[in-house]
Curated annotation (Swiss-Prot):
<dbReference type="Pfam" id="PF00591">
    <property type="entry name" value="Glycos_transf_3"/>
</dbReference>
<dbReference type="InterPro" id="IPR017713">
    <property type="entry name" value="AMP_phosphorylase"/>
</dbReference>
<dbReference type="InterPro" id="IPR013102">
    <property type="entry name" value="PYNP_C"/>
</dbReference>
<dbReference type="InterPro" id="IPR036566">
    <property type="entry name" value="PYNP-like_C_sf"/>
</dbReference>
<dbReference type="GO" id="GO:0005829">
    <property type="term" value="C:cytosol"/>
</dbReference>
<feature type="binding site">
    <location>
        <position position="204"/>
    </location>
    <ligand>
        <name>AMP</name>
    </ligand>
</feature>
<dbReference type="InterPro" id="IPR000312">
    <property type="entry name" value="Glycosyl_Trfase_fam3"/>
</dbReference>
<feature type="active site" description="Proton donor">
    <location>
        <position position="257"/>
    </location>
</feature>
<feature type="binding site">
    <location>
        <position position="265"/>
    </location>
    <ligand>
        <name>AMP</name>
    </ligand>
</feature>
<dbReference type="InterPro" id="IPR017459">
    <property type="entry name" value="Glycosyl_Trfase_fam3_N_dom"/>
</dbReference>
<dbReference type="Pfam" id="PF02885">
    <property type="entry name" value="Glycos_trans_3N"/>
</dbReference>
<dbReference type="GO" id="GO:0046125">
    <property type="term" value="P:pyrimidine deoxyribonucleoside metabolic process"/>
</dbReference>
<dbReference type="InterPro" id="IPR000053">
    <property type="entry name" value="Thymidine/pyrmidine_PPase"/>
</dbReference>
<dbReference type="InterPro" id="IPR035902">
    <property type="entry name" value="Nuc_phospho_transferase"/>
</dbReference>
<comment type="similarity">
    <text>Belongs to the thymidine/pyrimidine-nucleoside phosphorylase family. Type 2 subfamily.</text>
</comment>
<dbReference type="Pfam" id="PF07831">
    <property type="entry name" value="PYNP_C"/>
</dbReference>
<dbReference type="InterPro" id="IPR036320">
    <property type="entry name" value="Glycosyl_Trfase_fam3_N_dom_sf"/>
</dbReference>
Amino acid sequence: MNLILDMIDISTPVILLNDTDARQIGVLEGDRVTITRIKTKHTIAAPVSITKTLTSQGTATISLGTNENLAAEKGDEIEIRAAPRPASIAFIRKKMDGGKFTREETATIISDMSSNVLSPSEITAYITAAYINGLDMDEVEFLTREMVASGEQITFSKKPVVDKHSIGGVPGNKITLLVVPVIAASGLLIPKTSSRAITGAGGTADLMEALAPVAFSAAEIKTMTEKAGGVIVWGGATNIAPADDMIVTYEYPLKIDARGQMLASIMAKKMAVGSDTCVIDIPIGPGTKIPDEAEGRVLANELITLGNRLGIRVECAVTFGGSPIGRNIGVNLEVSEALSLLEGKRGANSLVQKSVAIAGIALEMTGKTGADSGAEAAYDIIKKGKALKKMLDIIEIQGGDPKVKSTDFPVGEHTFVVPAASDGYVVSVKNQALISIARAAGSPVDHGAGLHLHKKPGEYVKRGEPLLTIYAERGWRLTRAIEEARTSYPVLVEGMLLERISSNR
């Protein structure tokens, strides 16, 4: 059937058909059709959604997400035909029954996913099957290679090419803003692609965006890295391993992070940007993704094994993740804290130590320093101002202000100090509670929102002294953040009353 094309501004791949047209074509809700643009003869597939009112008879409405592959224009004539069920469905059902994917089956699934042949429910079924029944190392390798092949890849003539990654879960993780310039200043290449915050108070891409643009193509990333030695960019703006981004999108509502998918996701991005050397930070402890050291070692061995299969040398650092890195959480607060350290000012010990430790491992792996001297060399690069100079070079090549200073980042004018209710030592902080408070205050959307942690575990505080200060750009945001702080007890001081429980009599 030939119809006239209309469009709707949503990203979900879908085609809306009037119920009368759908009956004539012979499709039901959730079925898929092929869409051919008559002018170019280009054909794609998309899942069907049926409506009586949103699309009139004789018209088909596709989402912008669908049109990314069709490249049509509103008013074009298109041909719609019922499409057969893709082979991927049988492979997904096989995994549901406990089977194992072959390389060819994985390739078909990723191809169908990338070209929007699979519907959202079918992608969700794939993710759920892989989560419940798991992926062995062969399947993880297949998945990694196919995710890389689904998009653009970068190749550098100069070697080695370094990358770093953190498993996440720790607030205030701004170390990329120090690690990347240290590594680049040593003469190595580091094309760092980063993510935005999904559930956190600020992803690395959010932080870097306060300093410079972060959306670039793969070709631009290569050129900038070769000129400046490194970049810090948003991976979501590229066409690098796009199948991975799609899977993550469907994982998020389920709040699941399948182990095999996580391994493939990490390594696909590294492989696609041409990295041959990678340092991976695995934070452990309460509130992190990895509960203890034993589990951290298991994950590290899996990442190293996968790296060996892919030709990437991987070393992992199992680190303490029980409290924030540094004392600031929120975009401007974290950027200011990181730049302050690069400028040679005194900073939080946790931020300095972790940054030079991760950078130092990379320097040792690449032969820039001898064994056990990498951290010292990394600290020396910071102390001598080489890392600051390199960071300003990176900021400039990405389109930012090379004269920027740590004092150039304002915080929200609405503030609230959370005081200690008693004297004593801070026994713990709740990472997730701090993240929730910062997000309630407006971070990462409001760059001036967030919090400053005055006291960390092991430090003494007197009654009435500040535990943390909350910053917000809007009054109502501050009110929400205060409510979150009062109910979550983000900083625990020994002897403090957490709850009073009375009888009903």
